[in-house]
Amino acid sequence: MIARLGLTAINDLREALPRFTQVPLAHLPHLDIEQRRAYWLDEISQSLADESSIAFVSVASGRISGFVIYNDLPWDSQIIGRRTGTVKHLAVTSANAVGVEILAELISELMQTVGKRGTQCTVSRVQSSELAAIHALEQSGFLLVDTLLDFVFDFSRTPIEEITFPKRDGQLKIRHANAADLPALIDINEKSFSDYFGRYHADPQMPAGTATRIYTEWIRAAFQGWADWILVAELDDKIAGYGLWRKALRNEERNSVSVAHYDLAAIDPKSRGRGLWTALMLDGMWIARDFAQYLVGPVHVSNYPVQHLLQKFGWSISGARHSFHTWLKP
């Protein structure tokens, strides 16, 4: 049976969580299971409390066997120019064909509902190990648009002082960004991401120009408070690259998940190969060390140069996530 799911059912979900096949925060293997479930329940509660929330639960023999939760994405919607939302949570208690069927039914119910609301683009991101969710999304018409590898650096296992970094270019300077730097960083974005291979570029139905504009607005949002610190790299007193970093998110802080995030970096194509990306990473790591035990950085599966650099300097791959998009006719 498929039924609507609301915040009032949070206690039922709390009891059901141990039966689900999903592993929250799978890229952080040091966390114990209770810490993971507390974090997951916190996230679920926030999603259900969102006024845009649409959620359904599958119940069999009086027990929850799966659920799906959707939230609008207002920032994405504004940039894309289409109402966009995300399948924030998609979980099932069985990883076999029965689980796929349960999830497919939940997705079908959800898509009918968001279609009536006027949602045009729906996105979903799932761990690469969640095969039931992947197959259910594919059967429901979702298109795979990218895969991100979750890289993690553990300060307790690899002291940053023991890492051998290459000698820096004598003309290179790393500093904190200020508001006057924004135009230069936007220019670097347009050069770096015009032919990128991320999910916005991979989606053939994404409106023209949207893919690059997403990254431009991302850096603009960083200056408006989304990022906790922005570093810029200068060569010969000219900005040639940047990196965006965030401290632990609120939900991570509440559940004692001691992480910092290296979310985005870009180097002017003319300045690549001179060690800017490595220098930005190192200086950001020194800052993050004061308040985080772990660093997390998502890297596109096809971005081999960055993968090689991270592994060279002590980062390791701890997980992978697939991104899916689907479009509904207006």
Protein language model regions, located:
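Conserved beta-strand-loop-alpha-helix junction that forms the acyl-donor binding cleft
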Residues: 70-71, 123-132, 269, 297-307, ...
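Acyl-donor-binding surface of acyltransferase catalytic domains
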Residues: 92-180, 320-326
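Active-site rim helix/loop that mediates acceptor-substrate recognition in acyltransferases
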Residues: 21-55, 206-229
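Conserved acyl-CoA
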Residues: 101-120, 279-295, 300, 304-307, ...
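Phosphate-binding active sites in nucleotide-utilizing proteins
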Residues: 199-202, 227, 232
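Glycine/small-residue-rich hydrophobic helix-like segments
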Residues: 232, 239-298
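Conserved donor-binding loop and adjoining core beta-sheet/short helix segment
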Residues: 41-117, 126-129, 155, 241-269
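A short beta-loop-alpha structural element at the N-terminal edge
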Residues: 1-24, 173-196
